[in-house]
Amino acid sequence: MILTLFSTIIRRRWFLVCLASILVIITLNSCSPSEFKTKAAQVSQIVFISPSDPDTFNSPQSESLFSRIVFGLLYDGLINENGVTAELEPALAESWEISDDKRRITFTLREGLKWSDGEPFTADDIVFTYNEIYLNEKVPTGVRDILRIGTSGAFPSVKKLDERRVEFTVPEPFAPFLRYVGGITILPKHILQESVRTTDANGNLKFLSTWGTDTDPEKIIGNGPYRMVNYTPSQRIIFRRNPYYWRKDTQGNSQPYIERIVVQIIENPDNQLLRFRTGEIDSLEVAPEMFGLMKREEKRGKYKIYNGGPASDTRFISFNLNKARNHKGEPFVDPIKSRWFNTLAFRQAVAYAIDRETMKNNIYRGLGELQHSPVAVPSPYYLSPQEGLKTYSYDPEKAKQLLLDAGFKYDSQGQLLDWDGNRVRFTLLVKAEEKTRVDATVQIQQDLKRLGIQADLQVLNFNVIVQKLQSRNWDAYVGGFGGGGVEPHSGFNIWYSQGSLHQFNQGPQPGEPKITGWEPSDWELEIDRLFEAGVKELDDRKRKEIYGRFQQIVAEQVPFFHLVNPLSLEAVRDRIENIQFTALGGAFWNLYELKVQPD
């Protein structure tokens, strides 16, 4: 689950996305420049793409989505999530046991595990990583947020049982804990312990300045399938196979099979497409507007466009429901508009007024599905329309009737007026960086105009949008969140009424000026209770019922009206074998199994 709208969600959820597989993040695209093909004719390799340089090689401190490409190659988790089935599978841990009271998980490591420098990987590394890094208040890391258990926010405890066994204890049953803790990066104690226990001249832990991007890449030690050997900023990162990696196939051959990975840093999407069409790139995410061209060239270009079905991302329109006032006593939202937005019939009318079928066919070129829920379709907790989820088919007449029944009215020019004669007009935000989203927002503007509503479109830079949302200074916006995998609790900070990403009714946040008059609605508090119940319930059937009720509330109350979910499409060269493409895992979740045939 994977670009996101907000930078904070990257801090809080990058490690969750990695749970889909240590390598799911490589689905960002890939390329193979001719200079590397020439120099490495005898070396099997794939060249991936990153649109940006990594911000650091110190994974707990990274806030960059694209740094995950590096970490996915350098590290394995204790367990992996299968990119096809979403089932949890052994990785560094060969097995795990859960106590009868569901509060203790004991992991048993594989025998003979080693770091990429040949040193043993043991339970000491796990205990060190958790106790001295992730749970260390002096180390700023978003990982610590996801380790908070239940409503108390208490942390798990971890202790070594012997060289190969480690035990985690949680203060109360917490259903997602195994999936969360099993995928978090473990760091080498023998390399980093001194930096965590000593400070620099300014009194800061030396760890905070350790493994920056100016570090010799060969000094970055991992436990994953590859080791980093070269980094040229704004150009490329080169990885070689880790000779100490633990995986072997059924014949006893070492994995991964591919010797070298090159990550080319190419920011411009047009340049990425150009390089793919000239044969220099091995893989490319296929946007709807480029599908026709790429499909026509599929055979000549010797690639296949894989279709994983609907992506796990969400796209929606949302209104600002916040009734609070800032520290000066001024309302965040114009009270006149706030009354509209907080009228359920208004939100439902907007939902009926948006022609999503036309949006899917014209803007997404038919390469998408209507989206009805914040939970990804591949998730076992997804509630489908066939199972009773409320949906909104395009029905402008029903939309008008809902508004009239709620006390709205029309003037002689067909403009919608509220109870007091105010024209219904508001600002609709969308980020400029995604053409498809802008086009969809223009259509929404036109659909609402036919309903008598004037939506003034503002196409703004991503960072400006973030600032407006965080300051509560907005009316409505078209946005989206990256996929959180199959676990609904990964959206906790979006849906919990006091969550940091509860943008449609943002409560008080740490470090900001005092706000007054904020209150969550009854249905928001009900969602709080459902999320609290969902993480304590360990029976999957009952969890599905709990999260089904959550999805039904969202559908009925429409804090987000979900739009079109594009298909997960990726073009991959035919010479790369053993691809098992899914929307959940992408093309390269099983990179260790892939083979490359000579051109």
Predicted features, each with a name:
Residues D53-P54, G112-L113, P173-F174:
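Acidic glycine-/aspartate-rich tracts in secreted/extracellular proteins
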Residues T108, D145-G203, T232:
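Surface-exposed binding/hinge segments that line
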Residues M1-S44, S157, S412, L416, ...:
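Short, low-complexity disordered leader/linker segments with a strong preference
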Residues L563:
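Glycine-rich and polybasic anion-binding loops at the starts of cofactor/ligand-binding domains
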Residues S30-T38, V84, E97, R103, ...:
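Extracytoplasmic/periplasmic ligand-capture domains
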Residues S52-I69, L92, E119, G142, ...:
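A structural "hinge/loop" feature
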Residues I49-D100, N131, K138, I221:
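N-terminal lobe/hinge region of extracytoplasmic solute-binding protein
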Residues V47, E89, R104-T106, R165-E167, ...:
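General beta-strand recognition
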